[in-house]
Amino acid sequence: MKTLNVLALVLVLLCINASTEWPTHTVCKEENLEIYYKSCDPQQDFAFSIDRCSDVTTHTFDIRAAMVLRQSIKELYAKVDLIINGKTVLSYSETLCGPGLSKLIFCGKKKGEHLYYEGPITLGIKEIPQRDYTITARLTNEDRATVACADFTVKNYLDY
């Protein structure tokens, strides 16, 4: 009987480890706007939420994001790509943390520490484009190691 229990446990653990993708999470879903995300970091998922889906249509809205850091953050770089029909149509990059530059409260955090952000973000655009598209966001540190990575799927049919 013990052998059967051990075998069942081993099979469950193997099946769990065999998965190479994280689940798709729903950020918000309303009549004309849906936003989903999936971690594109094979080693780590994270939590992300928006208070109200309709807030996204304003150019500043509140988010919550949380994770345990697998990499220290002395320097932090963001790269964001807008992908439509499988083609990158817009790419944006920015240094968020670096020597003499700390745009975020978690600059300087160490590996293993909890990262939690709750507050406003500004998109820098007046309207979210209508249609279905993907936004890939990747944060890397000074060693070019992935700190966080996500693919956001946006389905926007709002009339402005």
From Swiss-Prot:
Gene from which the chain derives: LY86
Record's signal peptide: 1-20
Native source species: Gallus gallus (Chicken)
Name under which the protein is recorded: Lymphocyte antigen 86
Major place of residence: secreted
Covalent S-S links between cysteines: 28-53, 40-149, 97-107
Stimuli inducing this protein: By myb.
Keyword list, A-Z: Disulfide bond, Immunity, Inflammatory response, Innate immunity, Secreted, Signal
Function: May cooperate with CD180 and TLR4 to mediate the innate immune response to bacterial lipopolysaccharide (LPS) and cytokine production. Important for efficient CD180 cell surface expression.
Annotated tissue distribution: Detected in the macrophage-like 10.4 cells.
Subcellular location: Secreted, Extracellular space
